[in-house]
A protein has these predicted regions:
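Structural core segment of the AMP-binding/adenylate-forming
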Residues: 87-163, 503, 519
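Conserved pre-ATP/AMP-binding loop-to-beta segment of ANL
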Residues: 26-29, 140-141, 155, 165-190, ...
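Conserved C-terminal "lid"/linker of ANL adenylate-forming enzymes
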Residues: 498-501, 512, 539-575
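Conserved AMP-binding A3 loop
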Residues: 41-45, 186-212
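AMP-binding/adenylate-forming catalytic core of the ANL superfamily
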Residues: 99, 116, 423, 428-429, ...
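Conserved AMP-binding/adenylate-forming
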Residues: 40-41, 55-99, 275, 319, 323-461, 467-470
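Conserved AMP-binding/adenylation subdomain of ANL enzymes
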Residues: 209-227, 234-324, 334
């Protein structure tokens, strides 16, 4: 198969995606990565062949069609496991690598995972948890040391691939011929919390293929000449759908980053022309640019150059590559486009990057929509907006619960409301949670995102920043505040709390706890003493939580929170 034009190919399921990628791009490099200090590559053909070999091995050992978890750092074999499980009729469960041991065990039990695939950082840690995960009968290390490989419960990834390849060579077509139910769950993504409050998002092949197709149709600026440096967590739905499925479908090349501390070095070395990032990375890049400019006393000169460059562009002369080469060389010198989603970026940041020669396209997504919902298209972007709805889905604004429409119209020109989505990318529901599933769908079948915004006359969507509950951190991670509030409610000294995301002094959105202490326990105490007592208790709580869920800022209130007649805190009053 050869592509005759720039229109991306569309696929009905993940197996078709990997197969047609191999047919289209063959021995072209898909992944570049480092292992034990050595640079290695994986081609599109190798990606397809490895999937079939591992899937065939799964069929031989009773794992085909079962639930398999995967956890760890970025590695091509992570995606091999993802494809092998889902394309054999089974379910993959990507786990957050920041989970505690207890949370890992709880999620494994909840998902009923029969095996777990993991990268080097989890050697020994997972096998040591075997007693806490009795349902997990096989541990599959990707990069084992001798001790891990010899463990009685492990079978290494390379061993399984060799087993599967031998079976394929002998004519075993069990895995190759399996019929996929495209409407059945193939991916289970836990959004937040422990088993008491977690929501497991169920996505099908149809959901993921639809989201991938939509991403490709919305990002026509990317093609088989595009190069990316991958820098996002592998369990993140944005990373998998947009950063692996869509990028591979377009024939692009990806360098898999070997640690956050090496991102800048790898950008400079591998010279990407395209990136998909979360706001934290972009904001960090932006701060570094201006910090360096200020250190050299060049701010006025750069600002003057920006004005001159912008004036020249208006008459068709683009001098950005000359004027700002010293700035863009820090990112390899060839970066032209960044797609960014997860939290809003400042318009000034977007304008400055554009002035330097790098276009930022903001988008919007949510795990329950696999995840892409909207994105700004190349040449058609609008500041403050997350773009228009992608193919495969529709968006509407539900203003039925908005009692301040006149104020909204005065402020934005349009009434705000809850962003609702309908389409082929919308999840099957929450795993074993009919009540939660029912709560997020309207009577006519639209998914309630829980985010508030408005849509202009041209269909551009704007998120006003007033979320219903979900906190989106600067690194793109999602946190449900109810979970943290539940933990705080167990502290006797705390009477009421509201957890939200606020920007700290560095401009990063962090978990912030607003606390109303029990006045009966602090009679005669000064506010400073109350603060220190609560701070110590929250420090102890933080030790039990993953880093991204830890409370970073504390504010002590003098009065109770305002409440509804049903005694629920009016969260929007403290946002």
């Amino acid at each position: 198969m050869k592509l005759k034009n720039r229109q991306p190919k569309l696929n009905a399921d993940l197996r078709e995606l990997v197969r047609t990628n191999a047919e289209c791009y063959g021995d072209k490099v898909l992944y570049i990565y480092k292992e034990n200090g050595e640079e290695k590559t994986v081609t599109y053909n190798e990606n397809w062949n490895r999937m079939n070999a591992l899937g065939t091995a799964f069929s031989r050992i009773g794992l085909m069609g079962e639930t398999v978890a995967v956890i760890g750092e970025a590695h091509p074999m992570y995606m091999t496991a993802y494809y092998a499980a889902t394309c054999g009729g089974g379910v993959i469960v990507p786990m957050d690598h920041d989970l505690s041991d207890d949370q890992l065990a709880e999620f494994m039990a909840l998902a009923e995972a029969k095996a777990i695939v993991y990268t080097k950082g989890f050697n020994h840690r997972l096998t040591a948890l075997a007693d806490k995960m009795p349902g997990c009968r096989l541990f599959i290390p990707i990069q084992p040391d001798e001790e891990e490989a010899a463990h009685p419960l492990t079978q290494t990834m390379n061993e399984l691939i060799a087993m599967g390849q031998a079976a394929l060579d002998a004519g075993d077509r069990t895995y190759l011929d399996v019929e996929l139910d495209r409407n059945k769950m193939c991916t289970l993504l836990f959004t937040s919390g422990t088993t008491g409050t977690a929501k497991g998002v169920m996505l099908s092949h149809h959901n993921l293929a639809s989201a991938t197709n939509a991403a490709c149709l919305s990002m026509l600026q990317f093609n088989d000449k595009s190069r990316f440096v991958d820098a996002l967590p592998m369990h993140h739905s944005y990373e998998v759908t947009c950063g692996h499925f869509a990028i591979s479908n377009l024939g692009a090349e990806m360098f898999i980053n070997d640690g956050l501390k090496n991102v800048s070095r790898n950008l400079a070395k591998y010279k990407p022309n395209s990136e998909m990032l979360v706001p934290l990375f972009v904001e960090t890049m932006y701060k570094r640019i201006w910090n360096e400019i200020d250190k050299k006393g060049m701010r006025q000169k750069v600002e003057t150059a920006i004005k001159a460059s912008n004036a020249l562009r208006k008459v068709g002369i683009d001098m950005r590559s000359k004027f700002f080469a010293q700035i863009t060389n820090a990112f390899g010198g060839q970066l032209k486009v960044i797609v960014c989603g997860g939290a809003p970026l400042s318009p000034q940041l977007i304008r400055d990057f554009d002035a330097f020669g790098i276009t930022i396209l903001e988008g919007y997504g949510i795990t329950e929509c696999a995840p892409l919902v909207a994105v700004n298209r190349m040449g058609k972007g609008r500041l403050h907006s997350v773009g228009t709805a992608v193919e495969q889905c529709q968006v509407r604004i539900d203003t039925s619960e908005n009692d301040r429409q006149e104020e909204d119209i005065a402020e934005y020109g349009y009434p705000t409301g809850e962003i609702c989505v309908q389409g082929e990318n919308v999840m099957l529901g929450y795993y074993r949670n009919e009540e939660a599933t029912k709560a997020v769908f309207t009577e006519d079948g639209w998914f309630r995102t829980g985010d508030i915004g408005y849509m202009d006359k041209d269909g551009y969507i704007y998120i006003t920043g007033r979320k219903k509950n979900l906190i989106i951190l600067s690194n793109g991670k999602n946190v449900y505040p109810e979970e943290i509030e539940e933990y705080l409610s167990r502290i006797p000294d705390i009477q009421e709390s509201v957890v939200l995301g606020r920007k700290n002094a560095q401009g990063e959105v962090v978990i912030t706890a607003l606390i109303y202490a029990d006045p009966t326990r602090f009679e005669g105490k000064e506010k400073a003493e109350i603060f220190e007592t609560i701070k110590a208790q929250i420090t102890d709580l933080n030790k039990t939580l993953p880093a991204f869920k830890q409370i970073r800022e504390i504010e002590i209130r003098d009065t109770e929170f305002e409440k509804t007649t049903s005694r629920k805190i009016k969260r929007f009053k403290v946002m």
